[in-house]
Curated annotation (Swiss-Prot):
Keywords: ATP-binding, Magnesium, Manganese, Metal-binding, Nucleotide-binding, Nucleotidyltransferase, Transferase. It comes from the Bacteria. The lineage of its organism: Bacteria, Bacillati, Actinomycetota, Actinomycetes, Mycobacteriales. ATP binds at G89, G91, R92, K112, D124, G125, R175, R182, D266. Nucleotidyltransferase involved in the post-translational modification of proteins. It can catalyze the addition of adenosine monophosphate (AMP) or uridine monophosphate (UMP) to a protein, resulting in modifications known as AMPylation and UMPylation. PANTHER family: PROTEIN ADENYLYLTRANSFERASE SELO, MITOCHONDRIAL (PTHR32057:SF14). HAMAP family: YdiU_SelO. It catalyses: L-seryl-[protein] + ATP = 3-O-(5'-adenylyl)-L-seryl-[protein] + diphosphate; L-threonyl-[protein] + ATP = 3-O-(5'-adenylyl)-L-threonyl-[protein] + diphosphate; L-tyrosyl-[protein] + ATP = O-(5'-adenylyl)-L-tyrosyl-[protein] + diphosphate; L-histidyl-[protein] + UTP = N(tele)-(5'-uridylyl)-L-histidyl-[protein] + diphosphate. This is Protein nucleotidyltransferase YdiU. It comes from Corynebacterium glutamicum (strain ATCC 13032 / DSM 20300 / JCM 1318 / BCRC 11384 / CCUG 27702 / LMG 3730 / NBRC 12168 / NCIMB 10025 / NRRL B-2784 / 534). Its EC number is 2.7.7.-, 2.7.7.108. Its cofactor is Mg(2+); Mn(2+).
Amino acid sequence: MNTAPFKLEADFASALPTMAAPWQGEEAPNPELVILNDDLAYSLGLDPTWLRTPEGVQFLLGLNPEPLTKAVAQAYSGHQFGQFVASLGDGRALLLGEARSADGVLHDIHLKGSGRTQFSRGADGRAVLGPVLREYIISEAMHALGVPTTRSLAVISTGRKIQRGSVAPGAVLVRVATSLIRVGSFQYSNISGGIELSQHLANYTITRHFPSLVAELSAPTPATYVSLFKAILQRQADTVGKWTRLGFVHGALNTDNTLISGETVDYGPCAFMERYRGDAKFSSIDTYGRYKFENQPMILGWNMARLVETLLPLLGATPDEGMTAAQEALVEFDDLCEQAIRKEFATALGLDESDTGTVEQFRELLYLHNPDITTLLRALTDNTAPPSGFEAFVHDWKTQDPDIEAMRAVNPLFIPRNHLVEAALADAVEGNLEKFHELLAAVTNPFDPTAGPDELRLPSEEGFEEDYMTFCGT
């Protein structure tokens, strides 16, 4: 056997065994590595050469015990479209363990589509190639755009044919996160283990994500957990600020899809708008627009309220003190989101974040004229003609001496536009990955004009977005 040159840790499984069910991936009849993210593998101390061996592919499927310590399915609850489900968990996923990057940070190595677990609730636990490649390309694009996100390490085709409306090739996604601790993780700890387990999970979260609070864990006080909650709020606000600047619609902001780290997770029904509008939604199952673009800050606030409900006994010496502390922190979330959004747009416009007047004027024009935000911001960056309705704004904006070099670093030329992603995936599931690799090269170097052909910069044809719909699909 080709021995693995690394071994994963089992940090989560060891620290929180009641939230981790030991499990193993499903055997694949004819596994084949479709794509491997070499740079990400190197950064995590994982040898790409070994990962390409048969033993490496088995490891990526959760089957080779050599580099594994204790693969587990994680337990969590969740509000899905506002409805609480007490036991969700990894129904088709596995945490293989954690890899430690050169800076000492632990990263979850996590499978999606690895087969049934005890949380599958009757589903087959599998995933199909198109949606798996979709998550790969969009998550890596988001990383390149500077958005906190889970990342994609590999895609493996399983050789299995999966029934999803039509027959599709089976696949497994190997994704990476600084952790997959969710709001739903705290909801599960609260109902299954009460405040003792919730405090244990909170302490573990601090060690994984908030090192400035670690020193307080030797003798934690209510202030420790208030600080934790405030830090989580800030991370959510920072992320939604970036989504808002980029015109990104997540589409499934359930509490089980809201990571404590602030990283974006679950790219099934997401989309990038090409007409900037508050009512934009693309998910086929978001019938009433709960997760439409303009609702994202509000929904994250709602999710944060569900989180703090699980922490109330930790936030004060008495129930009243805990409730007061929670309310005082939570009431600030709207302002945190607004500050983050204004900061993002100020940076995109090359202005100081204190210039709120210009930023607000720009935002008003976005909702009035519904431009393609990517094209518009690059037009400003490159001093080309802006779309109709922005002429007067641009004239005034230029008088403020915007920092054009700073703008070049944040305003992309390439994003994973919906029509381009769909075309690449349609070819990929038929075995032709040429368009996929071409688009991946462009969107992972989004500020480099030489990263892809000019047609990858262009919006879709008129009318495409009006009919475009996304599906979880996996």
